[in-house]
Amino acid sequence: MARTVPLERIRNIGIAAHIDAGKTTTTERILFYSGVVHKIGEVHEGTAVTDWMAQERERGITITAAAISTDWLGHHINIIDTPGHVDFTIEVERSMRVLDGVIAVFCSVGGVQPQSETVWRQAERYQVPRIAFVNKMDRTGANFFRVCQQIGDRLRANAVPVQIPIGSEAEFEGIVDLVRMKAYLYKNDLGTDIQEVPIPDSVKDKTEEYRLRLVESVAEADDALMEKYLEGEELTADELVAGLRRGTIAGTMVPVLCGSAFKNKGVQLLLDAVVDYLPSPLEVPAIEGHLPDGEVATRPAEDKAPLSALAFKVMADPFGRLTFVRVYSGVLEKGSYVLNSTKEKKERISRLIILKADDRIEVDQLNAGDLGAVLGLKDTLTGDTLCDDQEPIILESLFVPQPVISVAVEPKTKQDMDKLSKALQSLSEEDPTFRVSVDPETNQTVIAGMGELHLEILVDRMLREFKVEANVGAPQVAYRETIRKAVQAEGKFIRQSGGKGQYGHVVIEVEPTEPGTGFEFVSKIVGGVIPKEYIAPSEQGMKEACASGVLAGYPVIDLKATLVDGSFHDVDSSEMAFKIAGSMAIREAVGQADPVLLEPVMKVEIEVPDDFMGNVIGDLNARRGHIEGQETEQGIAKVAASVPLAEMFGYATDIRSKTQGRGIFSMEFSHYAEVPRNVAEAIVAKSRGYA
């Protein structure tokens, strides 16, 4: 089957923003105006097409990145609607990895919020071009120009308004297009009766001011246009669009649009901007990967090139296991066999699907640049590469943050034990930030994730989708241990008791390293003091010993172990003996190296009415928080703080009661920090069963 849409007419875009900025509503309107759905779905009514999980429809938040296709002006647009809640950051992360462009949605009242900054950083990491949509222009307190200023100041982006609103709040009635110098008024509630009118006198001055800024921004980036501009010639609309497109794709400009998705204003112009300014797969750098010999190679976005595709999401579905993929090069064909180069396993492509709203459309192939889903893959997980087995390549995987909170779960009945393990396996395959382990001491199943809401929703899904009722323990913090000074230590394992003995002996130097480096190992063995085949087992023993620290049994991180000396026995030495010796040496070294306990510290942002600010700051101080900034705007106080996760359990309930239900907060993992001595003593005592 030949390609139906040329590559230059494909757009792979995401819609991302802070929670409640109106992403899902914007997506719904895009689907309505582009003809995919014939009735508008509403988030608050629980009928949004992209919010298809029961919990999403109940809570009015988007949890999983739903992928949907639509068409506009002869272009094929694949859209991913991402969640705005920080507990679901992995969903944003994995969608950024496979997108070519993003619509960043901002609330015209709230402006740049904490999660907006997180999403922006993720887009920066993958160098994804962005356009901004200032939504909710009909809300009381809406201020388009203030939000443009914040995008420049807080996100350090070159925000270039390409539209300005006509009126705001209840008076918001239309939009001026600064590129084509046309004004549009919306005459009906559905947003389908749009009249082109002369630019109203009320916005003439603003129009001229922002048109001049737009022209100067575009001219500055292009010598030929600058020359034309300086000679006093007008730049044409086509020249402005081409200049904005170049700037957006290069990441030097962010075109800013406005509207109200809920009131059906500005969405068609937003779709025009997706086509005008965001890149096709041909206009972004070719995907890079590693060949089997470690060499870096690129794969061009062409159907004729060897196949390379990235699995960016796995989902349990009533019809089977759905694996969402982005095809970067070549063609993925139904019925073919491909290589999962990450796992080195062959997979059969039994069925291929693209999603249009709730409909699954079966297709025979996915071409370069396409997003779609494969049914029935057995071994492929998030971040794996699918490729041609004759031309193997491994694409860069996803950045997966470490979980920061864990709870113990157990089924309410013994009969549910099997169902629980199947449910947990299925959920952990879908979500790389969700980890399952068994506590070796209590034999309890422990689940770990990115926050309380994350785990709450996963437990809820176990009940709804897998019919497993579970008892859930109190949340536990993922503490870590590290060292503060460099020491030398040795580990000697000798066992002589008839028959073949055991002998392993290592001398190591251990030193602290930069935060976030984990465990590093270096061998400085020379002259065969320890045979080469015993060095890897020594390292393995050290690594395994670091899984349980000397203070309270938490993993030891951020240290470097250097193997400097040792000895061996011709007959009695073995890999196992050196593994045990390595383990003994690291435990001895960590014990001497001034070990300390580390705890996860969260970046917390809180918004409360001004009257409650004193209470909130006092409460944060009591929670060992460090206030990093505060500002007041229109009677709303915004507080930024760093607070240990251990002090934040149940905060959602506490802040509601302290602010009469009017306070909101968001938090995300920031860094690990040393636990104060008095708190650490209590944690250590509890871990040893003294408390």
Curated annotation (Swiss-Prot):
Report the InterPro entries cross-referenced here. Answer: EFG_II, EFG_III, EFG_III/V, EFG_IV, EFG_V, EFG_V-like, EFTu-like_2, G_TR_CS
Report the locations given in the UniProt record: Cytoplasm
Gene Ontology cellular-component terms for this entry are: cytoplasm
**What residue stretch is flagged as signal peptide?**
none
Q: Has the keyword Cytoplasm been applied to this entry?
A: yes
Classification via PROSITE patterns: G_TR_1, G_TR_2
- The entry's GTP-binding residues are 17-24, 81-85, 135-138
A Pfam family (short name) is: EFG_IV
> In this protein, which residues make up the domain named tr-type G?
8-282
- Record carries keyword Amino-acid biosynthesis: no
UniProt keyword terms in alphabetical order = Cytoplasm, Elongation factor, GTP-binding, Nucleotide-binding, Protein biosynthesis
Q: Which GO terms describe its biological process?
A: ribosome disassembly
> GO MF annotations for this entry?
GTP binding; GTPase activity; translation elongation factor activity
Grouped into one coarse class, the protein's main location is cytoplasm
The family database entries (Gene3D superfamilies) matched by this protein are listed as: 3.30.230.10, 3.30.70.240, Elongation Factor G (Translational Gtpase), domain 3 (3.30.70.870), P-loop containing nucleotide triphosphate hydrolases (3.40.50.300), Translation factors (2.40.30.10)
Q: Give the family from UniProt.
A: Belongs to the TRAFAC class translation factor GTPase superfamily. Classic translation factor GTPase family. EF-G/EF-2 subfamily.
Q: What does this protein do?
A: Catalyzes the GTP-dependent ribosomal translocation step during translation elongation. During this step, the ribosome changes from the pre-translocational (PRE) to the post-translocational (POST) state as the newly formed A-site-bound peptidyl-tRNA and P-site-bound deacylated tRNA move to the P and E sites, respectively. Catalyzes the coordinated movement of the two tRNA molecules, the mRNA and conformational changes in the ribosome.
PANTHER family named in the record: RIBOSOME-RELEASING FACTOR 2, MITOCHONDRIAL (PTHR43261:SF1), TRANSLATION ELONGATION FACTOR G-RELATED (PTHR43261)
**This protein is called what?**
Elongation factor G 2
Q: Which organism encodes this protein?
A: Synechocystis sp. (strain ATCC 27184 / PCC 6803 / Kazusa)
